[in-house]
UniProtKB/Swiss-Prot annotation:
Compositional bias per record (Polar residues), positions renumbered to this chain: 522-537
Function: Kininogens are inhibitors of thiol proteases. HMW-kininogen plays an important role in blood coagulation by helping to position optimally prekallikrein and factor XI next to factor XII; HMW-kininogen inhibits the thrombin- and plasmin-induced aggregation of thrombocytes. LMW-kininogen inhibits the aggregation of thrombocytes. LMW-kininogen is in contrast to HMW-kininogen not involved in blood clotting.
Residues with glycosylation annotation: N82, N169, N205, N294, N529
Site (Cleavage): P387, F388
Cross-referenced Pfam families: Cystatin
Additional facts recorded: Rats express four types of kininogens: the classical HMW/LMW kininogens and two additional LMW-like kininogens: T-I and T-II.
Name by which UniProt lists this protein: Kininogen-1
Keywords tagged on the record: Blood coagulation, Disulfide bond, Glycoprotein, Hemostasis, Inflammatory response, Phosphoprotein, Protease inhibitor, Repeat, Secreted, Signal, Thiol protease inhibitor, Vasoactive, Vasodilator
Tissue/organ expression: Plasma.
Species name: Rattus norvegicus (Rat)
CDD domains: CY
PTM annotation, UniProt: Bradykinin is released from kininogen by plasma kallikrein. Phosphorylated by FAM20C in the extracellular medium.
Any single GO CC term annotated in Swiss-Prot or TrEMBL for this entry: extracellular region
Length: 639
């Protein structure tokens, strides 16, 4: 697994190393990019002889190329400011001129970053649109500076064409090569132009014997050779390529072969695996296999995978097939017959046979080599099986899952004393009953929590009719006790003993209210109004696991009508109580930081382009600032 991890890391790392010198996009609000733009704009304003300076409006594009030298290439938009060229102000201290009269422009620049974090301009082209007038183009090129240019620049066309012709004319390769991809290009202004280009070449289907130079019918071969070249060209002032040199590295292609002619008597040819031509050759092959094999049973050809024939001084057959063990033994059968059936779990062989036949001499020379196929590993392991993924089967411990109602029933049988004596429950829950009827029946009973689960059991409390539980609201602290206390479906007074009246009416009953920091409404319905309570008691010999949700029959007890009515409800297998007194309420706003989820993976940083528009500082005229307070008198402030 460690080896696989290392290989994956290397596969991710190698492309990144190969692309180290490629241009990387930058955020248009990047500080270092702004410094480069500042240098370029100051250089442009310094070249103006009259008029106003230009102020940065917005950076629209930005790339960075790291290598032996670091270059910044970017585009930015400018607007005419209200500071003159001779004012001595920097462009940051100027405001925009009125939009109707102001000139606008866009500049494309390439700057080199030096070791002292200073920038030098390699090239800059600005297209200026006056407020009223045609576009004016201003170009600047650093004399003697080698700087990158666009690989799509039209000026590279003649240089690249000459580079490919130079390679084809000075190599001994049998085929012509064509231009693949231009990876980078640099230019230097001298008494002419120097170019440094890195490009790839690919082999075409045109041979040098048939084509003296590249033709429009020459297309790159998918599996042909390719290479990468570095070329240096010099173009004089007359736009003529006066010098060129290159160095290339070759990468051989995969599965490169020449197509054989259709009529080739001595060449191997593929034949169908079900061709009748193979019948005799297959017969000799299986006979040779059974003769050389010491196995007690005969083998029979099951599948022919591929076959070729070649005309030599006779015919040579090369066949690959799979042979399987049959039920016919060599002791009881003199030879293999067609009615011999193969064994379902018999041995299988992967065989390669060479059969040389000379019919006019009745000469047959078969040669068979076989390898045993391990069928057991194929049967036991599914496709894609890996020993690293073999599951470890862990025998689970024997345990018994017991539901709360079953625990109560067992406790009754083990401790009969609980049936008669009162059980004091400390259910610290005071609920306010909202009654919809004048008479509401209350039942004192011993059940699980509050309500009648069984006539006797753990806990006790009042039981209300199911129809009267449509509106309930809980006031006060809702204290939960972990052992034998709590409330179930029925809500009532948790204090008291398990003795009381069978029936009583209480129309105007005042319940004691307890002030609480929270008021939580409890919604109940006549159809589904069951809240399960986990009861922890004496359960020696049982292992309590969270059971699956299962229906529980809840008895409403004997009413005045004299019959028992059962209600089926779904009981939650887990404790639905929440210890609100231990966990404080945290009110979270939807837009707050705590409400937002944290991603498992870091978000990909997106490059923001174009950048934020520049907001110049309004520069006021000093004369106006002094005249604003010229009429101020100190006596006015003292009066």
């Amino acid at each position: 697994m460690k080896l696989i991890t290392i290989l994956l890391l290397c596969s991710r790392l190698l492309p990144s190393l190969a692309q180290e010198e490629d241009a990387q996009e930058m955020d248009c609000n990047d500080e270092s990019l702004f410094q480069a733009v500042d240098t370029a704009l100051k250089k442009y304003n310094a070249g103006l002889k009259s008029g106003n300076q230009f102020v940065l409006y917005q950076v629209t594009e930005g790339t960075k190329k790291d290598g032996s030298k670091t270059f910044y290439s970017f585009k930015y938009q400018i607007k005419e400011g209200n500071c003159s060229v001779q004012s001595g102000f920097a462009w940051q201290d100027c405001d925009f001129k009125d939009a109707e009269e102001a000139a606008t422009g866009e500049c494309t620049a390439t700057l080199e970053k030096r070791r002292n974090n200073k920038f030098s301009i390699a090239t800059q082209i600005c297209n200026i649109t006056p407020g009223k007038g045609p576009i004016v183009t201003n170009e600047y090129h650093c004399l003697g500076c080698m700087h990158p240019i666009s690989v799509d620049s039209p000026e590279l066309g003649p240089v690249l064409k000459h580079a490919v012709e130079h390679f084809n004319n000075n190599t001994k390769h049998t085929h012509l090569f064509a231009l693949g991809e231009v990876k980078s290009a640099d230019r230097q202004v001298v008494a002419g132009m120097n170019y440094q280009i890195i490009y790839s070449i690919v082999q075409t289907n045109c041979s040098k014997e048939d084509f003296p130079s590249l033709h429009e019918d020459c297309v790159p071969l998918p599996s042909g050779d390719d290479g990468e070249c570095k070329g240096n060209a010099f173009v004089d002032i007359h736009k003529t390529i006066a010098g060129f040199s290159d160095s290339c590295e070759f990468y051989p292609g995969d599965d490169l072969f020449e197509l054989l002619p259709e009529d080739c008597p001595g060449c191997p040819r593929n034949i169908p695996v079900d061709s009748p031509e193979l019948k005799e050759a297959l017969g000799h092959s299986i006979a040779q296999l059974n003769a050389e094999n010491n196995h007690t049973f005969y083998f029979k050809i099951d599948t022919v995978k591929k076959a070729t024939s070649q005309v030599v001084a006779g015919t040579k057959y090369v066949i690959e097939f799979i042979a399987r063990e049959t039920k016919c033994s060599k002791e009881s059968n003199a030879e293999l017959t067609a009615d011999c059936e193969t064994k379902r779990l018999g041995q299988s062989l992967n065989c390669n046979a060479n059969v040389y036949m000379r019919p006019w001499e009745n000469k047959v020379v078969p040669t068979v080599k076989c390898k045993v196929l391990d069928m057991t590993s194929v049967i036991r392991r599914p496709p894609g099986f890996s020993p690293f993924r073999a599951p470890r089967v862990k025998k689970p411990k024997e345990s018994t899952t017991v539901s709360p109602s079953y625990i109560a029933r067992v406790q009754e049988e083990r401790d009969p004393g609980n049936e008669q004596g009162p059980i004091h429950g400390h259910g610290w829950l005071h609920a306010k009953q909202i009654k919809n009827k004048n008479h509401q029946g209350h039942k004192h009973g011993h059940g699980i929590g509050h309500g009648h689960q069984k006539p006797h059991g753990l806990g006790h409390g009042h039981q209300l009719k199911l129809d009267d539980l449509k509106q309930q609201r809980e006031d006060g602290y809702d204290h939960r006790h972990p052992v034998g206390h709590g409330h179930g479906q029925r809500h009532g007074h948790g204090h008291g003993h398990g003795h009381g009246r069978d029936k009583h009416t209480n129309k105007d009953k005042n319940n004691v209210k307890h002030t609480d920091q929270r008021r939580a409404p409890l919604t109940s319905s006549s159809e589904d109004n069951t809240t399960s309570t986990q009861i922890q008691g004496r359960t020696e010999g049982f292992t309590l696991n969270p059971p699956l949700a299962q229906p529980a029959v809840i008895s409403r007890g004997f009413q005045d009508s004299g019959f028992t009515e059962g209600v089926i409800a779904t009981t939650s297998p887990y404790d639905t109580e929440t210890h609100d007194d231990l966990i404080p309420d945290i009110h979270v706003q939807p837009d707050s930081l705590s409400f937002k989820l944290i991603s498992d993976f870091p978000e990909a940083t997106s490059h923001k382009c174009p950048g934020r528009p520049w907001k110049p500082v309004s520069r006021k005229d000093p004369t106006i600032e002094t005249t604003e307070f010229s009429d101020f008198d100190l006596l006015d402030a003292l009066s």
